[in-house]
From Swiss-Prot:
Gene3D superfamilies per the UniProt record, alphabetical: Peptide methionine sulfoxide reductase
Cellular component annotations (GO), alphabetically ordered: cytoplasm
Keywords: Oxidoreductase
Catalytic EC class: oxidoreductase
Any single biological process term in GO: response to oxidative stress
Family membership noted in the UniProt record: Belongs to the MsrB Met sulfoxide reductase family.
Identification of the protein by name: Peptide methionine sulfoxide reductase MsrB
Xref: InterPro entries: Met_Sox_Rdtase_MsrB (IPR028427), Met_Sox_Rdtase_MsrB_dom (IPR002579), Mss4-like_sf (IPR011057)
Amino acid sequence: MTKPQKDELKKKLTPIQYFVTQENGTEPPFQNEYYETEEEGIYVDVVSGKPLFSSKDKYDAGCGWPSFTKPIDEAEIIEKEDRSHFMVRTEVRSKNADSHLGHVFPDGPGPNGLRYCINSAALRFIPKAKLKEAGYGAYEKLFD
């Protein structure tokens, strides 16, 4: 997949989606689309449509953003050192579209101890009941 040009993305994405994914922004905590979503399904990159996270791995970390213990496929995620805002963190980006997604922290509950803290604006949620219809039928097995 070739990443769309900036002008195409400005037409396709909402202002907050563009700010987060293309300008490495952060949406407000607790005031975002998927923070409280509990429905089963997958979360895909809002730019490329690549599957990134599953509701099976989502949990309430109390931080105000959707949090996951792991990605669906680690090969779709790129981690980079982020030294912005006078901190050292690990930024999470999508491999194909190079979208800024959020950050990963070593304080999660899963076996790997990681918390993927992801901006809702970087994601599109596909409910379990609509996976096949939306072209993601191969991911139905995650919910068996």
